[in-house]
Amino acid sequence: MEQIVCQLLTDPPMPGPVNMAVDEVLLETVTRTGSPILRFYTWSEPTLSLGYFQLFSERERHPESLSCPVVRRATGGGAILHDRELTYSLSWPRRELPPGVDRKATKGSEWMYEWVHQSLIDVLAELGADAQFCKPTAGAEKSFLCFERRSGWDVGLGDVKILGSAQRSYRGGVLQHGSLLLSASPFTPQLAGLSEQGFPLGLDPLT
């Protein structure tokens, strides 16, 4: 896979509203400058983020996280409990394609899912983890939590989903952000991360 050139940001832990605001500002910036921006970040406290089309009342479906602050993402998909994970965002000018991507062979900005997720699969392979794209699960989109859903662009390790992403298009730009589960959170103990799969990684090897 050919490399792409992006402005790289690595931010310290910040509250949910700040993290979401920064991602939206970066998307707006890309629409003006045409230069892609890749950002890695974490959260200052366990936070539940709702997909754009989820209702705030739906958080009652996950009582374990009712004590956590809640924010709404600009992107769709299921809710995510941001705790022991690494979050990334990629803001990209919609009119541009990286080397090796055929506009006729890709649907809209779907190439970004494959590009980013395959890059992570390659990094994990170097660390000894055999991650793969997930097989879609029928009916899983009804689940409240993102990591209880499966699409063909998600990344799994064995039968465990470890990476999910979502997108939003805005004027001349596309925002894609996603979460990589490093280990299970006490608020979502049923969702295993890399640590439970035998790969107790910190943030440095991945960023």
PLM regions with names:
Residues 150-167:
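Aromatic/basic-lined ligand-recognition segments
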